[in-house]
Amino acid sequence: MEKTFPMTKEGLDKLKAELENLKLVKRPEVIDRIKVARSYGDLSENSEYEAAKDEQAFIEGRISTVETMIRYAEIVNNAKIAKDEVALGKNVTFVEVGETDEESYQIVGTAEADPFTGKISNESPIARVLIGKKVGDIVNVPLPVGEMTVKIVKVD
């Protein structure tokens, strides 16, 4: 059985848009660059040709990866999950015990994780600890060095 890729509807839509861009924009662009580089003649010392071929290989690999993720996407359905329970697709806000600054993250599938925009993978150490917990729960979150104790203050 193939691995499934749990994700939000938004994440699936982003992957579909990326795939369309790769196939309709990026692939034709790199093919044109290869044609131009070939027109320069000798390919043995043609760095533009080599760079374009490398980019083409990357694009084709990414197309294959994205197609697989779309094919085996598993859209999360939180209808049966309690409103105050942390789950994939939900936003969770917590505060370190003894502190006042809140931190908020959306827990998403690995394919759509982007910590810089507040989206953490459901497979990350912090998400694994938080999933299934509820507002008011106090948990120990692993850090690269040690851990911190946090209280879940909001889930939506």
From Swiss-Prot:
Keyword Ligase assigned: no
Keywords: Coiled coil, DNA-binding, Transcription, Transcription regulation
Keyword Oxidoreductase annotated: no
Coiled coil: 2-27
SUPFAM superfamilies linked: FKBP-like, GreA transcript cleavage protein, N-terminal domain
Alphabetized NCBIfam families for the sequence: greA, PRK00226.1-1, PRK00226.1-2, PRK00226.1-4
Family: Belongs to the GreA/GreB family.
PANTHER family: TRANSCRIPTION ELONGATION FACTOR GREA
Identification of the protein by name: Transcription elongation factor GreA
Biological source species: Lactococcus lactis subsp. cremoris (strain SK11)
Source species taxonomy: Bacteria, Bacillati, Bacillota, Bacilli, Lactobacillales
Name of the gene encoding the protein in the UniProt record: greA
